[in-house]
A protein has these predicted regions:
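An N-terminal assembly and electron-transfer interface module characteristic of large anaerobic redox
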Residues: 1-153
């Protein structure tokens, strides 16, 4: 697919956000969110674009590294997949360094959480981990506000 008038391949960056402190607390959550991110990457690739998938960015340090990686790969656009709650400090360094437009993906793993199964779990830690797998919308207002304040389109 030709992405611009120069005939070069259109390249999109993809990264997902999470919070590194969650992984040791909630068994399987990191792997689950990584799997969802892979699904998004495959869907993007089906459109014919080149996808630079940096996976889960879950700390400010990884955010800085991701921003540099997107610049190095000369991405034309970034898809930010909000997989669960995360801090704006895991987002802002990426988009500031990349200096390209960003599309927020607020996608849920399914149409709704299965509350019947959820309420039968009986273990509050497992329940919280399950809830976090459906917590995409939690961070979107914070991210949108940070983008607005920093004038990021």
């Amino acid at each position: 697919m030709s992405g611009d008038s120069r005939g070069q391949e259109f390249t999109v960056g993809l990264f997902a956000i999470g919070l590194d402190t969650y992984w040791p607390q909630f068994e399987g959550l990191q792997q689950r969110l990584t799997g969802y991110t892979q699904q998004v990457a495959h869907r993007l690739e089906e459109t014919g674009v080149r996808v630079i998938n940096l996976g889960l960015v879950d700390s400010p340090e990884k955010a800085e590294t991701a921003g540099h990686a997107f610049r190095r790969h000369d991405v034309d656009l970034i898809f930010l997949y909000v997989t669960t709650y995360a801090l704006s400090s895991t987002v802002l360094p990426v988009v500031r360094r990349a200096k390209v437009p960003v599309i927020l993906l607020n996608l849920s793993p399914s149409a709704a959480i299965d509350y019947k199964s959820f309420n039968r779990m009986g273990d509050r830690t497992r329940m919280t981990g399950e809830w976090l797998a459906y917590c995409q919308a939690c961070s979107v207002p914070e991210i949108a506000n940070v983008f607005r304040r920093c004038r990021i389109p």
